Amino acid sequence: MQKDKFGPCAPSRIPLLSNDLISMLSGGVAATVSRTAVSPLERMKIIFQVQNNKEYTSLTSTLVKIWNREGLIGFFRGNGTNCLRAFPYGAVQFATFNMLKQRALKNRSHQNLENHERLLFGAIAGAASCATTYPLDIARTRLSIETAGLTSRSLAINNVANNSLKVKPLTLWSTLLYIVQHEGGYPALYNGLPATLLNVVPYVSICFFTFEFCKQKFFSNADLTAFQKLFLGGFTGIIGQTLTFPADVLRRRFQVNRIPGIGHNYKNIKSAIFHIYKTEGINGFFRGYSSNMLKIIPVMSITWYTYETVSKMLHDL
């Protein structure tokens, strides 16, 4: 029994949704909203990372080229696929972390994770969300560069002289089908997964650790204001991405490794690292970093703000 506006003998309130389901729904909504908000910056980052020439050299020139070639819709190329991936990605990630957190704290007198638990649970959440949605991640990357003029196929799409060839832009399903049919069957849908895990696992681990640690250390796990949610979310993104960005470059390179016209032909992660360093120097590992920082701060701010807000709203149902 609990005291409330109905008096001391009012029945205890029964939650409408379980904690795991709330985490899943909140995480899915947060990921979808944040990815859509920064879709133009995400597309520019991917183009910077995978290009094999110097066609796209700055944010301004890239904005102009996308606008001239594709119009407004070009800035959101691949976002539909990204949203299809973002919802389950965010849902699995947040639900996994919070499920592990709840189990760990179940029989404890205090409600704070140890630092190593934050890192471990974040890593597991990152691996789980990445593995379950990876084919959609590959498709999103392919669609992002499909009309950017980086491949022989995309040049045909953009070349008016080739209109008679009826080379049509790929869709989500045709992209997945093309990969299966021409790049090695169903296992090809997971090309580059090790490089992706090398990026995603430490990134998600660092983000969960940073947010949880700062929320406990500086705000005593109290409900955060809107500004605090936005600020802390952006801060976690800066820390996580700066420490793991070279792995993100490797991730994108492997996802387009077999596309004709790109020119990359990496055999494994080690050969890719040596080749990038030899041909592009240390700067090659930070291609797209500036545009990514413009993206990651708002995306993580929006993600954590939306997650915390939606989660509280669902708990109050």
Swiss-Prot record:
It comes from the Eukaryota. The keyword Isomerase does not apply. Solcar repeats lie at residues 18-103, 113-217, 224-313. InterPro entries: Mit_carrier (IPR002067), Mitochondrial_sb/sol_carrier (IPR018108), Mt_carrier_dom_sf (IPR023395). One of its GO terms (cellular component) is mitochondrion. Its main location: mitochondrion. GO terms for biological process: adenine nucleotide transport; mitochondrial 3'-phospho-5'-adenylyl sulfate transmembrane transport; mitochondrial 5'-adenylyl sulfate transmembrane transport. The chain crosses the membrane at residues 14-34, 72-92, 119-139, 196-216, 230-250, 291-307. The keyword ATP-binding does not apply. It is a multi-pass membrane protein. This is Uncharacterized mitochondrial carrier PB17E12.12c. GO terms for molecular function: 3'-phosphoadenosine 5'-phosphosulfate transmembrane transporter activity; 5'-adenylyl sulfate transmembrane transporter activity; nucleotide transmembrane transporter activity. Keywords: Membrane, Mitochondrion, Mitochondrion inner membrane, Repeat, Transmembrane, Transmembrane helix, Transport. It is found in: Mitochondrion inner membrane. Belongs to the mitochondrial carrier (TC 2.A.29) family.
